[in-house]
Amino acid sequence: MAILNFQKPDKVIMIDSTDFEGKFEFRPLEPGYGLTVGNALRRVLLSSLEGFAITSVRIEGVDHEFSTIAGVVEDVTEIILNLKQVRFKRQIDEIDNESVTISVSGEEQLTAGHFQKFISGFQVLNPDQVICHMDKKVSLNMEITIEKGRGYVPAEENKKANAPLGTIFVDSIYTPIKNVKYSIENFRVEQKTDYEKLVFEIISDGSIHPKDALTEAAKTLIHHFMLFSDERITLEADEIAQTETYDEESLHMRQLLKTKLVDMDLSVRALNCLKAAEVDTLGDLVSYNKNDLMKFRNFGKKSLTELEELVSNKGLNFGMDLSKYKLDKD
C-alpha cells in the first residue's frame, strides 16, 4: 500500500526581524500540526534557553534582605527586585560568570547603566533599569555575581556553601525570551483549504536574536525526539534501573574525581584552605568555579595558580557538572 506523503514546509519564512523581535511563517502543515509544533516550540522558547542573570548580591553595611540603607529610598528587598530585571549579553565567549564590585557616589539614582564600567565580560542590555534612588552624599558599594543558567532558578537553589557573610542570593530569570505568540491560519494547497499556516512572533531581551532563539528551541526538541528512534528504544529499562552501568571512561572519571586532595602534591597552604572549606576530593574541587574558590578564607592567587595546574594536568575543568558520574552512589 502506498504511503501518503505529509504536507510540510521546506523552509521557515522570516517576515520581520530585529535584534529584539522576529516574526516567522511556517507552511503548509497538516491539520492539527500547527498547534502541535507551535505549542512545543513556545514552551521550549520560554523555559529552556540559556541566558545570564544576577545570582547574588552583597551590599556594604547590609546583613540581610530585610534591611534598609541610610540615604537610600528603596529598602533592600526592593533593590533585589530591581536587580532581577537587569539583562546581560555575554561579550567574551569564554566567560560564563563574573563577580564585580560596584561603587557609586554623588548620584541621585543608581541604574543598571552604572554597572557597565565595572563589568568586563558582559553588556548591560537595559541600562535605564532603575536600581534605587539615593542621596548624593551616599556612597553605595555592592558586589554582584552574574552567572549562566536556564529558565528560572529560585534563590534557594542559587545558594552556595561558604558564601561570604552578608551574601544575599537572588531569584534568577535567565530566559532571554520575553514573550512568544503564535497563531494558526488556514492555508490552501491546490484545491484543499484545510491545511495550516503557523505564524510565530518572538520578543527577546536582545541577548539572542529571535532567529537564533527559534533555531536553538528546535534543536532542543530534535535532541529529545531522537530518543524515540528505533535504536534508542529498548526493553532493558527495568534492568538498567536496578543495576547502574558505566562505560570504562565513566568508571575512570569516577575514580579520579573521588581522589583525595591530601594524596596530591599540593602545598600546605592550599590544602589548609581547601580543608577549611570542606573540599576533600578532586570532585569537590572542580565542582567550584574559580570565582568561588577566591572567596575561600586565606585563599590567594598563588593557590589558585597551583590548583589550575593540578586540574589541567588531570584533564578536568573548574565548574564541571558532575551529576552524570553519580558520585553520591557508591
Curated annotation (Swiss-Prot):
Alpha C-terminal domain (alpha-CTD), as annotated region: 248-330
**What molecular function does GO assign, one term?**
DNA-directed RNA polymerase activity
- Keyword vocabulary terms for this entry: DNA-directed RNA polymerase, Nucleotidyltransferase, Transcription, Transferase
Highest taxon above the source species: Bacteria
* Any GO CC annotation of this UniProt entry: DNA-directed RNA polymerase complex
Give EC number(s), comma-separated: 2.7.7.6
What's its catalytic activity? RNA(n) + a ribonucleoside 5'-triphosphate = RNA(n+1) + diphosphate
The annotated region (Alpha N-terminal domain (alpha-NTD)) lies at: 1-232
Q: Which GO terms describe its biological process?
A: DNA-templated transcription
Relay the domain remarks.
Answer: The N-terminal domain is essential for RNAP assembly and basal transcription, whereas the C-terminal domain is involved in interaction with transcriptional regulators and with upstream promoter elements.
Similarity comment text for this entry: Belongs to the RNA polymerase alpha chain family.
Subunit structure comment from the entry: Homodimer. The RNAP catalytic core consists of 2 alpha, 1 beta, 1 beta' and 1 omega subunit. When a sigma factor is associated with the core the holoenzyme is formed, which can initiate transcription.
Q: What is known about what this protein does?
A: DNA-dependent RNA polymerase catalyzes the transcription of DNA into RNA using the four ribonucleoside triphosphates as substrates.
Protein name per UniProt: DNA-directed RNA polymerase subunit alpha
Gene, per the UniProt record: rpoA
